[in-house]
Amino acid sequence: MEKAIERQRVLLEHLRPSSSSSHNYEASLSASACLAGDSAAYQRTSLYGDDVVIVAAHRTPLCKSKRGNFKDTYPDDLLAPVLRALIEKTNLNPSEVGDIVVGTVLAPGSQRASECRMAAFYAGFPETVAVRTVNRQCSSGLQAVADVAAAIKAGFYDIGIGAGLESMTTNPMAWEGSVNPAVKKFAQAQNCLLPMGVTSENVAQRFGVSRQEQDQAAVDSHRKAAAATAAGKFKDEIIPVKTKLVDPKTGDEKPITVSVDDGIRPTTTLASLGKLKPVFKKDGTTTAGNSSQVSDGAGAVLLMKRSVAMQKGLPVLGVFRTFAAVGVDPAIMGIGPAVAIPAAVKAAGLELDDIDLFEINEAFASQFVYCRNKLGLDPEKINVNGGAMAIGHPLGATGARCVATLLHEMKRRGKDCRFGVVSMCIGTGMGAAAVFERGDGVDELRNARKVEAQGLLSKDAR
């Protein structure tokens, strides 16, 4: 017991702010017993001041491409509101941000990079704050968060933003230019060019995922998303966007404020989905109803060192634990999460049973069902508020959206929900996953009452 108390005393030293801080943390910090729960392999590190934590995570509503409420909204006008929200809701000085990394997929690289820089200016960031983009297909938003976490951990800066943006109205999926003839010599390279829907059919056929299983997954996604919307569960994560709708016939503009996802269909049933024809294969099972929606939207996540969050008195929404990106056969790219999730969970010193919630992107019902079954996951833990088949999948923004949805749900569930995972498949044959820990442990330290005596004893021992 004495060794444990001494070890905790050393850990607490990591949390003490610099001498320049005016807050008296000496009296507010005390050691208390920490257990790893059911996972003995997991080494509790959540008291370290150099943990990378998330203090805010927000997103726009997600709207149907070309037909939804963002059809007349510029991409930079989607990103700016969520960047601004991070600053306004935390009262952070924007000049303190070391970098803004934005995941984005479809737009030309140099153009989208300029749009993201412009959005930062709209949001109130000074010229001294750098901006860059990152593209790892559908995991780009999560990759942006992971890149920022890694940079903070490496000491490049203490505060950063990982974001995601996609306007599939503005930038539809299309290959520009000719294809290198050399691709014909490499089967796997050829498979990188397969339409995503064809890879979905490959997964369904190879692993025996039935049409009914896929349609049922879509029904469940819409049902859960509709229930979450009705219960107001998305209000904490969604930032309303003021924009416009343009009448295509008259050109008249109508100002609107978008505050809810517009692709959710509460009345979706197996019967209605069963009437839809396969899209990618004559006798296939992948339809418009059991695939993710083509969407417009953005999301942003504010990360910093835990010690900085404590100095600023900011509640911690979550702790970034690990990230993994893996490669799989491009012809069945949808299996990516089934490989990436175990890799990320293992890197965190955990087992799958330790994870309380999963946000797994529903690119296609076929691959979602396969990954769920392959890993033997409890359906009650996965996409509890619906997924991309109902909410939408704006490629570059999905990772940031999933992080926001996961962390706010973990916060609502409290101590019964400690670890969460975000994961998705990636076009051309990859998968990505990240592990997060619920972040309110720091609040207990920050809000702890002054301890006059027996400062190194746990509450149970006093």
Curated annotation (Swiss-Prot):
Disulfide bonds join C138-C192. The active site is at C138 (acyl-thioester intermediate), H393 (proton acceptor), C425 (proton acceptor). Pathway: Lipid metabolism; fatty acid metabolism. The keyword 4Fe-4S does not apply. Its main location: other. Keywords: Acyltransferase, Disulfide bond, Fatty acid biosynthesis, Fatty acid metabolism, Glyoxysome, Lipid biosynthesis, Lipid metabolism, Oxylipin biosynthesis, Peroxisome, Transferase, Transit peptide. It comes from the Eukaryota. It catalyses: an acyl-CoA + acetyl-CoA = a 3-oxoacyl-CoA + CoA. Belongs to the thiolase-like superfamily. Thiolase family. Forms homodimers. PANTHER family: 3-KETOACYL-COA THIOLASE, PEROXISOMAL. Involved in long chain fatty-acid beta-oxidation prior to gluconeogenesis during germination and subsequent seedling growth. Confers sensitivity to 2,4-dichlorophenoxybutiric acid (2,4-DB). Required for local and systemic induction of jasmonic acid (JA) biosynthesis after wounding. Seems to be involved in JA biosynthesis during senescence. May be involved in the positive regulation of abscisic acid-activated signaling pathway. This is 3-ketoacyl-CoA thiolase 2, peroxisomal. It comes from Arabidopsis thaliana (Mouse-ear cress). The gene is PED1.
